[in-house]
């Protein structure tokens, strides 16, 4: 049973950690949107679209079995390694802006990682099923543990499963930073973007990478909160 210092399901001082995480994520999201909007107005001198740039980058890397698809949404661009599909959003696919080409090159970076069996990408892909399971069941276990009178075993099992999300987000960081590094190098070497345009693409990709840093920081703060609330408690 829980005792001493338990604040219940309502407000407690550790919520400040959650609020800090939310603010960090909101600031990162606002920055990537404003940075993308700024460089989305800057047209590349080459005049090619992001989709054309993606095809050129993939072929230049000797990759011909990745399909480039147009999907709905803004900044929903992604690379799907299970189906070997590079998805470019409405804001990216037909755009010839520095921002759009930078984003497309970043996703190509993931495709190249996949082709080269880049270890962090493979590790991230391997743990996805376990992480998804943990994310689904962690909070229900914590809540059930509280409802049952403060079962330390159930609650800490929930906390352990939640920690898998933190691990996933930490593994994601080198994957994203490496993809951006590859993208910028390729854009320069292939002359898809000129030197002055590379600077804009770098700012867009850096802002995007910071959203992953913010998400990881937010999850770490949430995990810290759970450990502060429940880590020192025991079942009777």
Regions found by a protein language model. Give the residues of each.
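Polar-ligand-bearing catalytic/cofactor-coordination segments
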Residues: 1-8, 30-134, 167-223, 228-236
């Amino acid at each position: 049973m829980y005792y001493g210092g338990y604040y219940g399901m309502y407000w407690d001082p550790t919520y400040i950690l959650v609020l800090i995480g939310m603010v960090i994520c909101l600031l990162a999201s606002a920055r990537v949107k404003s940075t993308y909007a700024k460089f989305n107005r800057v047209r590349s001198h080459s005049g090619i679209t992001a989709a054309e740039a993606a095809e050129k980058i993939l072929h230049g890397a000797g990759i011909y079995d990745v399909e480039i698809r147009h999907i709905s949404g803004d900044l929903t661009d992604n690379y799907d390694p299970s189906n070997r599909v590079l998805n470019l959003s409405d804001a990216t696919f037909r755009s010839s802006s520095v921002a759009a080409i930078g984003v497309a090159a970043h996703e190509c970076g993931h495709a190249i990682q996949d082709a080269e069996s880049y270890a962090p990408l493979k590790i991230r892909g391997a743990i996805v099923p376990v992480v998804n399971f943990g994310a689904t069941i962690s909070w229900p276990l914590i809540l059930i543990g509280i409802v049952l009178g403060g079962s330390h075993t159930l609650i800490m099992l929930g906390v352990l499963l939640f920690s898998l999300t933190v691990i996933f987000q930490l593994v994601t960081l080198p994957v994203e930073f490496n993809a951006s590094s590859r993208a910028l190098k390729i854009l320069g070497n292939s002359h898809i973007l000129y030197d002055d345009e590379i600077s804009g693409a770098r700012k867009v990709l850096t802002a995007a990478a910071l959203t992953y840093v913010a998400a990881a920081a937010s999850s770490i703060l949430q995990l810290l909160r759970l450990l502060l609330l429940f880590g020192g408690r025991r079942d009777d």
